[in-house]
Amino acid sequence: MSIFTPTNQIRLTNVAVVRMKKGGKRFEIACYKNKVMSWRSGAEKDLDEVLQTHSVFMNVSKGQGAKKEDLLKAFGTEDQTEICKQILSKGELQVSEKERSTQLEQMFRDIATIVADKCVNPETKRPYTVNLIERAMKDIHYSVKATKSTKQQALDVIKQLKETMQIERAHMRLRFIVPAKDGKKLKEKLKPLIKHIESENFDQELEIVCLIDPGCFREIDELIRCETKGKGTLEVLSLKDVEEGDEKFE
């Protein structure tokens, strides 16, 4: 599709329109095809690679720009780049039913892939296949949301699947080394955040290799930095812990 904008004599091609209705008005932005979903998933971070122009339209196909007073009333600002970001994140991507169906199917698959990669069966410590996760998502009638990133939705799926099957986030393996004088006190503070201690060496320094829930990593990192005043070290040994030699099962 080629769109001619008579107001500025720019011909926009390969256009994907994102639309938002706000304050009783319709606002549209012109984006490059295949870039909107990349932006929403976090894969694309350069706005200039997504937007064809940092302009807000009433109607992209007719080249009708939005009035400043309408933008101010609806969005509380005249900054068109910021408004473009809002529309890009929360607006409705205008695509054909076939295109929409294909995009949602791909997002469904991507979400299942993330869940399968990040989770295990807590009883066997074995990972699940993508196909099994897809079937489980269908069983709970999970509906993909085009405006949310696949990573965000994967977290939602994990929470919902916990109600129907044995599943949990795979553990992260860490090694941390802290000065001996901080060791005992710090270990007590870290205990509630550690799932399992694999090895512990207390000589001139305290060195511990342990498994944690990935959601606790930031808190552990902050604790070690604050309590040791930057003298402690924290190393991620593996992002997920599954039993070696085990194969994925359906």
Curated annotation (Swiss-Prot):
Compartments, record wording: Cytoplasm; Nucleus, Nucleolus; Nucleus, Nucleoplasm; Cytoplasm, Cytoskeleton, Spindle
Record bears the keyword Cytoplasm: yes
InterPro entries: Ribosome_mat_SBDS_CS, Ribosome_mat_SBDS_N_sf, Sdo1/SBDS, Sdo1/SBDS-like, SDO1/SBDS_C, SDO1/SBDS_central, Sdo1/SBDS_central_sf, SDO1/SBDS_N
Domain of life: Eukaryota
N-acetylserine, modified sites: 2
Main location: cytoplasm
GO BP term (any one): cytosolic ribosome assembly
GO CC annotation, single: nucleolus
Gene Ontology MF terms in the entry: ribosome binding
UniProt cross-references to Gene3D superfamilies, sorted A to Z: 3.30.70.240, Ribosome maturation protein SBDS, N-terminal domain, SBDS protein C-terminal domain, subdomain 1
Keyword tags: Acetylation, Cytoplasm, Cytoskeleton, Nucleus, Ribosome biogenesis
Job of this protein: Required for the assembly of mature ribosomes and ribosome biogenesis. Together with EFL1, triggers the GTP-dependent release of eif6 from 60S pre-ribosomes in the cytoplasm, thereby activating ribosomes for translation competence by allowing 80S ribosome assembly and facilitating eif6 recycling to the nucleus, where it is required for 60S rRNA processing and nuclear export. Required for normal levels of protein synthesis. May play a role in cellular stress resistance. May play a role in cellular response to DNA damage. May play a role in cell proliferation.
Family according to the record: Belongs to the SDO1/SBDS family.
Subunit structure: Associates with the 60S ribosomal subunit.
PANTHER family per record: RIBOSOME MATURATION PROTEIN SBDS (PTHR10927:SF1)
Classification via NCBIfam families: RNA_SBDS
Protein name: Ribosome maturation protein SBDS
Organism: Xenopus laevis (African clawed frog)
Lineage start: Eukaryota, Metazoa, Chordata, Craniata, Vertebrata
